[in-house]
A protein has these predicted regions:
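Periplasmic-binding protein-like
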Residues: 84-91
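Terminal peptide-recognition signature
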Residues: 3, 36, 56, 88, ...
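Short amphipathic alpha-helix with an adjacent loop that forms part of the alpha/beta core around
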Residues: 72-83
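Glycine-rich phosphate-binding loop and adjacent beta-alpha segment
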Residues: 95-174
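Mid-domain Rossmann-like dinucleotide-binding core that forms the NAD(H)/NADP(H) cofactor-binding site
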Residues: 1-71
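Aromatic/hydrophobic pocket-lining residues that form π-stacking "cages" and hydrophobic walls in ligand
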Residues: 32, 77, 165
Length: 178
């Protein structure tokens, strides 16, 4: 449900756009990527490890998947997104977001579903304050950055989700693992 509503309502994917998905092989990320492909996007997944990336490409149908543990992850992301990033589905935060930020296109959309990299944080990470850069980028590039709480924001649309997602699963367009 978060994948469906966050991507379709906030991300608003259009054919030919580049969608980057963090936590690409988790339940939400895997679904986001597959819906992105159904909508005609070029999908770049980000996952932790070669096996997860292989799964994203071979089973889920992503175009590319990058291992965020790689020393040159940021450089790989630049190469994987030669036309920039139109949608970044945020599940993680941290260094993945830092690598994505400079690649965002004008009018990019960022549905914020989670920030797993900072769930247990009790203080800000060391280093420079990145908020001014984030806000300047959001302003200059007119980026839509929107968090959402699925039950509160979209609970009333559960039947829409069940109908369309049920059809996609029935037609074998969306794959999932329990």
């Amino acid at each position: 449900f978060p994948a469906y509503m966050g991507l379709l309502d906030i991300g608003q994917p259009k054919e030919g756009e580049t969608l980057v998905v963090a936590a690409a092989t988790g339940p939400v990320g895997a679904t986001v990527g597959q819906i992105g492909k159904l909508k005609g996007c070029r999908v770049v997944g980000v996952a932790g490890g070669a096996e997860k990336c292989r799964h994203a490409i071979e089973v889920l149908g992503f175009d590319v998947c990058l291992d965020h543990h790689a020393d040159d992850f940021a450089e790989q992301l630049v190469k994987a997104c030669p036309k920039g990033i139109d949608i970044y589905y945020e599940n993680v935060g941290g260094k993945v977001f830092d690598a994505v930020l400079p690649l965002l296109n004008t009018s990019a959309r960022i549905p914020v579903c989670g920030l797993v990299s900072s769930y247990n944080a009790t203080e800000l990470p060391p280093g420079p304050d990145r908020l001014p850069l984030l806000m300047a980028t959001v302003l200059k590039k007119r980026i839509r950055l929107q968090g959402f709480i699925i039950a509160q924001d979209y609970g009333h649309r559960i039947h829409e989700f069940q109908k369309e997602m049920g059809q996609w699963v029935k037609e074998d367009k969306i794959h999932y693992h329990e």
